[in-house]
Design a protein with these regions (language model features):
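Core catalytic region of metal-dependent phosphoesterases/phosphodiesterases
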Residues: 1-98
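Structural motif
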Residues: 12, 59, 120-121, 151-153
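Conserved beta-sheet core of the metallophosphoesterase superfamily
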Residues: 126-227
Length: 231
């Protein structure tokens, strides 16, 4: 929050998703110390705290992640049909009140599942391979018209990546860039004990841009940086 409050001229804030752990909707049976109601309370307070440190005129956006979508998907392995009305966080207190302050983007791998702000395209993310940031950047650039000089931002992999240019080959650059903001969650969760989390991290992607699309034929009309939360 201190990092956010120190930023000047913020007009848009985008949460890239997985606001909830959604352990109640996991297909892997387990017992947790917290309940789904606890998650709603924590998420509501967390999003409200973000709004409290940014200018009142800021546009607040939330892109649903796969964990969030698990609570709303019609999948009987996760949530029985008879319970879905009460697990839909958009209609369940204490979270639904806070949700009204945010503009929501669904979890879909198509144009409806991303948010476009000027030359920037944002989504939660879907794949986790080492080159998935670049591959999804190319996919979403195609989905959104293929205009040059755009920046793609996502999360999902939990691995922060600074602004990086896409390449056809090592010697042939493409006119698109990507970055990854990592995760806001735990960096060494128990369920990852047998896997490598050394590249995991929390970060904030900060972008200064010209939003007018008529400027895109002049080249890159944005500057971006990644603020690592451990810095």
């Amino acid at each position: 929050l201190e990092t956010l409050s120190a930023l000047d001229g913020v007009t848009h804030f985008v949460h890239l998703g997985d606001i909830f752990e959604a352990s109640a909707a996991s297909v892997h049976p387990d017992e947790h110390d917290h309940t789904l109601l606890d998650e709603y309370r924590h998420a509501s307070a967390f999003l409200a705290s973000i709004r409290s440190v940014l200018p009142k005129r800021t546009h607040f956006h939330a892109i649903m992640g796969n964990h969030d979508d698990n609570l709303r998907s019609q999948d009987p392995r996760r949530i029985p049909k008879a319970l879905r009305d009460v697990t839909d966080f958009m209609r369940t207190e204490p979270f639904s009140h806070e949700a009204k302050f945010w503009h929501w983007t669904p979890y879909r791998k198509d144009k409806r599942g991303c948010l476009e702000i000027g030359p920037v395209v944002l989504t939660h993310g879907f794949d986790v391979g080492q080159n998935s940031d670049e591959l999804e950047a190319l996919q979403f650039m195609n989905m959104t018209g293929g205009a040059a000089h755009r920046l793609f931002i996502r999360g999902h992999t939990h691995r922060p990546v600074p602004p990086t240019q896409c390449h056809r080959t090592r010697s042939i650059p493409l006119p698109w860039w990507y970055m990854n903001a990592g995760t806001c969650g735990p960096l060494s969760p128990s369920w990852m004990a047998r896997r490598d989390t050394s590249q995991w991290g929390a970060a904030i992607a900060v972008v200064d841009m010209v939003r007018d699309p008529s400027h895109r034929n002049r080249g890159r009309q944005w500057e971006a940086r990644l603020i690592q939360m451990d810095e």
